Amino acid sequence: MSYVDEIYPSDTSGFYSYFAHQDGKSYLLARVTYTNIGTEYALPGYVTEASFEIAGNKYSGKIEINAGPRFGSNYHVEAKDTATVAIYCLVPDSVKDSGETKLTWSIPTDQQYMKTYYQLTFPHDDFVITM
């Protein structure tokens, strides 16, 4: 995890989309590798949930699949395929580096929920990264 002013996709050789700098704010970004171990496609941008906590302050995370020159929460990951996922939130610069930072990423444990929208009632595992 790191603080950045802008978020770029992996392919910036031609036309691409990115998340631009906003005055007085920074993105807290985690780039993670997601492997779909299921037997059908998955929509990790829709069916997973992320949250950040910085020194007790809570922020909702956004989950975007890095698809070359673009990002999107609607991109799917085929069975047995791997994708890079950008999990991020926009925070005021005043909280940047102000204490322990934690990312919690909740992923359903049952494949039947991997093609819909996330619900707290789904059985899920929480993966936590702390810095």
Q: What does each of the following model-derived ranges do?
A:
Residues 1-131:
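Conserved functional micro-motifs across diverse proteins
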